[in-house]
Amino acid sequence: MRVPKKERQRLLQETIEHNPFIKDEELSKQFSVSIQTIRLDRMELKIPEVRERIKHVASEHLDEVKSLSMSEVIGDMIDLKLDDSAISVLDIEKEHVFSRNEIARGHVLFAQANSLAVALINDELALTTKADIRFSRQVHLGERVVAKARVMKLRGDGRTDVTVESYVGEECVFDGDFTIYRRGEEEQA
Amino acid sequence: MRVPKKERQRLLQETIEHNPFIKDEELSKQFSVSIQTIRLDRMELKIPEVRERIKHVASEHLDEVKSLSMSEVIGDMIDLKLDDSAISVLDIEKEHVFSRNEIARGHVLFAQANSLAVALINDELALTTKADIRFSRQVHLGERVVAKARVMKLRGDGRTDVTVESYVGEECVFDGDFTIYRRGEEEQA
DNA sequence: AAAGAACTTAATACCTGGTACTAATAGCAG
DNA sequence: CTGCTATTAGTACCAGGTATTAAGTTCTTT
């Protein structure tokens, strides 16, 4: 039943992660050590007491409502030549990924690319009307995505074709062809 | 400062509902009564102590995470038949629109549709690999968007084609064809 | 085998945010 | 004034800890 300290602490961490509601007493039974040992372990691993853990879970729940405000999922613009080309950078953080596997959600990459394409247009009103997009590689928590947009064709009728390619390092992770409508008040973005 | 009992209890209930983390002590200050009075009030109203309230909020949260992260869908899922069809509703609010003209940003509609398409897939891992989308009408602040997703083709190779159409009332405002990858750990969403 | 270090357990005082219960007081109506 | 409700006070007790000091118990290393 009894496992060495290192192993016990690894298991402890896992156990608590998967059930934050468990008390020291239960843990001590589960690992067949004294309560004090569990507490030392928690200290070393910097795991807070059960009430704090519960509070943490609960408070995450509360912000969930406002979490996906989406308003600024767009990254930082680092270069912009209107009606020509633009570059933005987005660091993938916790709120951008599926909690289960830490892979960035599709609409995050889309949002970065779309926002960039729209920003590129030198006009008061610019709205996306159409987009063909491909996700070519997963993007993980902590990675930095650089999106590069270029105007391909400025049509006379108010439509502009913009291509966006997003990279993590050398690798292309996303690309899309956007048609942006400018000026008029029809169409959609 | 001091309000009659009935009124105080009504406010107490509201206060706690909107902030379940509040302690008796704070409440007693807020209502300028003693802690004991607050406790009598809670008794009468059958409101549990703060730790229980927090635990309750937290456990709701856990359920959600386990129940295949409905929370990760944007908008409210109102119907879901796995691997068949799904419907979600999203009310367009301030954070979804361009402040200049109160038109919903493209990636908001995309996010609703994309999330719905991904949620539809009856698998642990589901990631968008490709999407062709069209925005056919502007969506304005305050409008309610209903997205309807339907699985079109379940290919053998792990790819599934999903079509999503989003409506405001009778009008189609967005539609898209998504290719979702399931299972494996390649590709991207 | 003895010494030391690392690990484990024990014991005790104290903390927060309560419950449960008893009793005293305040404020007002009849 | 009596009676009633509402409020406040006080005490004992609880869970689930923290923090600290001290005492074993192993394991290793010389």
Curated annotation (Swiss-Prot), chains A, B:
InterPro entries (UniProt xref): HotDog_dom_sf (IPR029069), Thioestr_dom (IPR006683), Transcription_factor_FapR (IPR017275), WH-like_DNA-bd_sf (IPR036388)
Pfam families according to UniProt: 4HBT (PF03061)
Coiled coil stretches, renumbered: none
GO biological process terms on file: fatty acid biosynthetic process; negative regulation of DNA-templated transcription; negative regulation of fatty acid biosynthetic process
Keyword annotations of the record: DNA-binding, Fatty acid biosynthesis, Fatty acid metabolism, Lipid biosynthesis, Lipid metabolism, Repressor, Transcription, Transcription regulation
SUPFAM superfamilies documented for this protein: Thioesterase/thiol ester dehydrase-isomerase
Molecular-function annotations in GO: DNA binding; DNA-binding transcription factor activity
Keyword GTP-binding on entry: no
Membrane spanning stretches: none
Domain of life from the UniProt record: Bacteria
Family statement drawn from the similarity comment of this UniProt entry: Belongs to the FapR family.
Function: Transcriptional factor involved in regulation of membrane lipid biosynthesis by repressing genes involved in fatty acid and phospholipid metabolism.
Protein name, entry field: Transcription factor FapR
